[in-house]
Amino acid sequence: MTHSLKPWNTFGIDHCAKHIVCAENEQQLLSAWQQATREGLPVMILGEGSNVLFLENYAGTVILNRLKGIEVNETADAWHLHVGAGENWHQLVRYALDNNMPGLENLALIPGCVGSSPIQNIGAYGVELQRVCDYVDCVELETGKRLRLSAAECRFGYRDSIFKNEYQDRVAIVAVGLRLSKQWQPVLTYGDLTCLDPKTVTAQQVFDAVCHMRTTKLPDPKVNGNAGSFFKNPVVAADIAMELLERFPNAPHYPQADGSVKLAAGWLIDQCQLKGVTIGGAAVHRQQALVLINANDATSKDVVALAHHVRQKVGEKFNVWLEPEVRFIGRSGEVNAVESIA
């Protein structure tokens, strides 16, 4: 007996898992994990499946993290939110704004669960989770022991954290603590946000602008399956960036604190005239080249072949090699996404 994963991944790719368990509390999550381990099955914890590509049928148990709840504590200088890992991220952004607690608005409409946000250190329009993260509560899967990691202990990087490294498959995230400062500072560095006046802008205006940009540029997974940005924006050494800017002076680029330079993957793909290109049922989105979509009953092989094609074209033109932001899941767990498309 197998169970379809199609409803549980936003790419809408039709693979199956041996078992799918919905965990609404910590105990259910732990017992499902321990049961699978006793049976010698691979096991993975999934939020809303908005950042994964299943490459084949999964030979084990998929646990859906549905731990809910939002608690708010107010201090003189901040609001402190303790949020269950299974809460929807965008609903949390709206909840905070509706209750006059700004600070999350740049991260509006990012798909997925709150518990997935620290794994990727989600970010958009100049703000990353690490800016507002206070702590992450986890449970050790083998022992059931609770751990609270401070933001510093999470070792956040660009789309990276300790949860993608040492703690991968060792812990489950059960809640995330956020600190929203009462000294709200708008971040207006990207896209349409640069047109807003920092002196008069409200958090609601930032939220509305972000939602407008995302809905006009990004496809709705309910219409065309996708996992948002398929590739990371590449971060390159300063000399490589200089070389590229000599050849392409209008290339968007964002100097980083450590001297490296972040490039815009979507722009690089667009310059290779790849918008609308299809392989099988997979396509490069026509509005936002960074997004690969399930345009017509795509298989995972179609998506991988298209990602390979995009990576090759960009690499040949710019000598910059893109890496997937989406996580690739094989028969018994995560596999190296770069190797899969190289």
Swiss-Prot record:
Cofactor: FAD
Catalytic reactions of this protein: UDP-N-acetyl-alpha-D-muramate + NADP(+) = UDP-N-acetyl-3-O-(1-carboxyvinyl)-alpha-D-glucosamine + NADPH + H(+)
GO cellular component, one term: cytosol
Family affiliation: Belongs to the MurB family.
Pathway(s) the chain acts in: Cell wall biogenesis; peptidoglycan biosynthesis
Subunit description: Monomer.
Top EC class for this record: oxidoreductase
Name of the protein in its database record: UDP-N-acetylenolpyruvoylglucosamine reductase
Active site: R159, S229, E325
FAD-binding PCMH-type domain sequence ranges: 13-183
UniProt-listed SUPFAM superfamilies: FAD-binding/transporter-associated domain-like (SSF56176), Uridine diphospho-N-Acetylenolpyruvylglucosamine reductase, MurB, C-terminal domain (SSF56194)
